[in-house]
Amino acid sequence: MLLLCLPASVAAQLLPAFPGAEGHGRYTTGGRGGNVYHVTTLEDSEAKGTLRHAVKQKGARIIVFDVAGTIYLKSDLKISNDYITIAGQTAPGQGICIADYPVIISANDVILRYLRFRVGTESIANGGEPDGLGGMDRKNIIVDHCSISWSVDECLSVYGSENTTVQWCIVSESLRSSGHSKGVHGYGGNWGGAHASYHHNLMAHHESRVPRLGPRPGTQEREYMDLRNNVFYNWAGNGCYGGEGMKVNIVNNYYKPGPATPNSAVRYRIAKIGVRTTAYCTNSDGTPNAWKPMEHVWGQFYVDGNVIEGNANVTADNWTKGIYEQINNKECDNTFNDQVKAEMKLSAPLETEFVTTHTAEQAFKQVLLYAGCSKERDIIDERIVKAVSYTHLRAHETELHL
């Protein structure tokens, strides 16, 4: 009865985006109540019936699919107009895959569900170094049951926004030697935001940023992030790091080292926390840049219940070796001290929008069963999940053109 007495605009905000939507982005409206556009062809053009045509329309809209298969983009697909739902679960058969160029979220109130993003190296010839799925500096976004792989830069970097959720996704096989201008690359993603939730995702086979806890200038003073019930497998160079000035829950995640994971401290890393250094916050001419407000500001973290497979000590005590011993004080302008050590550790979790929470071991099983574009998994996701499930299966980089 209380809900019926509220103004319509307020009541709408209290409706979940869809059954099963959780976390800080759960009340995203997307295209609710808007026009319905049918994708009837896999061609990429601005003609009616294409995905690009539907995305470019204005006003609230829901995009459904009458076809299945791979849409080979001819250029970046930018979602620029607010209030959109792209419902990949409506496609027949094995669903929809988007390839060759990235999809970029540049709008507010966006719902993406049951889609595959396998970008590959096609756009490098045109100067691109694409993410698989990217978006920042927006609000009200939820990405659900998507599969993202084969990026040149990060696979999934949806961050620096307000009220976001990324849930039940598979983020795998960023390309390590694909022609990126910086050389060896292959990163999982930048994750963070002002009230951002990342839960029940699988990140597998990445060189680094698994994930990178990454603030943006627009949200750096109010970064508030919940990272729980994710599975991280076979990180190589740097694993999870960052968190400069952020407030973060790191709860009940499952870390499984793989064949590419070094036999060093990174093997039992939960997160390598850092700060914005003076050099980072200063332009080449000596003037302060956009990061200056957070110079030498340490974040605060609630870390509990995380499992490092094969390391009972760090599983029992997440902080000593999983967090504290990972910090490089020299890289932090020697600002890490006993006071910082005490203040960065929260005794109670940050409040968060509701997320069904499992133990790390339960989450491992649930994620392998249900994450990704799992209405009908393709052979890529099946292979990734099997590699995580069976230690003896060796990881290998796939640099194929879809």
For every predicted segment, state its role.
Residues 43-44, 68-69, 91-92, 260, ...:
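Acidic glycine-/aspartate-rich tracts in secreted/extracellular proteins
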Residues 228-389:
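Extracellular beta-rich repeat passengers
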